[in-house]
């Protein structure tokens, strides 16, 4: 005997309408082709399934938390650490959350220059103020702590030193922090293996949401 019960639950979908933004991607890819050929692989990695899945998951849960626990009528100012090319995270944020100002921080200045092109729609046509900061994050906490932001996001916390000293100028700022356990990679200097370890690593006191997703890490050796 087999009994199967299906229970339906409503799921709010994110807005994936990137078409307005994608018309600038041709310019971005032309810049890669003619000026930064070595960035082809960065573009590919930015849109690989693991990165896309992680970004969508982060924005889904962040949006849900903001709607349920952090009601605010005006727009949000958001700080993104290790923003890289800004895709897919910037379009996901701008299409699904009311963004007033974005601070995108990365040590890779070429990636930031490409981000300005790939995300031009939100800057030039949606009039979202986007600031690109070329900073080495562990040594820039003094500057970053002066920013008055509502949300701090990092999808690659394993690539940075612990964020305990990052406070921002808003003591009520929400932190959305993703990390991984890919310690085999040389850039994984700050990996964790549990949600509890990540909370301690980031110096967080109160949490609205914790979760874990399994992804596949491909070792080609």
Regions found by a protein language model. Give the residues of each.
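S-adenosyl-L-methionine
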Residues: 5-73, 114-146
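Conserved class I S-adenosyl-L-methionine
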Residues: 73-85
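Conserved SAM-binding loop of SAM-dependent methyltransferases across substrates and taxa
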Residues: 85-98
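Conserved SAM-binding motif I beta-strand of class I
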Residues: 101-106
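Conserved SAM/SAH-binding beta-strand->alpha-helix loop
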Residues: 108-110
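A short SAM/SAH-binding and catalytic strip from SAM-dependent methyltransferases
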Residues: 149-163
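C-terminal substrate-binding/active-site "lid" region of AdoMet-derived donor-dependent transferases
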Residues: 162-220
